[in-house]
């Protein structure tokens, strides 16, 4: 969970603000943790993982790139663009993608410091992930980070 807190956790409890800024402080990006035994939502407020779906769903994250299936953990960054208003509005989707990019940067920096291997990726089976993670229409998987060890 330390990695999740660094990615998008609350670092100013008095205001509820996070380690990654977001447009209008809407905090639209949620971090999902995909492990071999299940997929979890990172609850920033309580600094804990909540089980969303049992089973190994790393195939959905892999999106055809087999190396991702062997990563011990993958982080999926989901923007709930409804927090900006109209979820169908292109500008809101672009802002959600930007916010996910900021969280992605935090993950990359944390992993570099912790000597973990990661790569930000846009490739994934978003349709399958939406089912597995039980996402609403306005929740869009934007990026993912397989995390592992250097060979």
Predicted regions and their residues:
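Small-aliphatic-rich amphipathic alpha-helix that forms the alpha element of a beta-alpha
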Residues: 3-5, 31, 73-77, 81-83, ...
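N-terminal amphipathic, basic helical "cap/leader" segment at the start of enzyme domains
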Residues: 4-71
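Solvent-exposed loop/turn segments at secondary-structure junctions
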Residues: 9-11, 38-39, 80-84, 126, ...
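Short, surface-exposed helix-loop/turn micro-motifs enriched in polar/charged residues
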Residues: 23, 118-121, 137
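A residue-level signal for beta-strand positions that form part of recognition/binding surfaces
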Residues: 28, 72-74, 142-144
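A short, hydrophobic/aromatic-rich structural module that often spans a beta strand
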Residues: 54-57, 127-132
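A glycine-rich helix N-cap at a beta->alpha junction
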Residues: 134-151
């Amino acid at each position: 969970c330390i990695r999740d807190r660094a990615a998008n956790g609350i670092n100013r409890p008095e205001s509820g603000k996070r380690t990654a800024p977001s447009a209008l402080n809407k905090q639209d990006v949620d971090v999902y943790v995909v492990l071999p035994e299940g997929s979890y939502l990172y609850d920033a407020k309580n600094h804990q993982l909540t089980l969303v779906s049992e089973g190994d769903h790393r195939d959905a994250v892999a999106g055809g790139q087999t190396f991702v299936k062997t990563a011990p953990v993958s982080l999926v960054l989901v923007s709930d663009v409804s927090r900006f208003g109209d979820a169908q509005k292109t500008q809101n989707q672009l802002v959600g993608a930007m916010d996910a990019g900021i969280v992605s940067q935090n993950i990359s920096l944390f992993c570099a410091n912790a000597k973990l291997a990661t790569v930000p990726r846009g490739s994934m089976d978003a349709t399958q992930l939406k089912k597995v993670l039980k996402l609403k229409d306005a929740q869009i998987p934007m990026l993912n980070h397989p995390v592992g060890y250097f060979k």
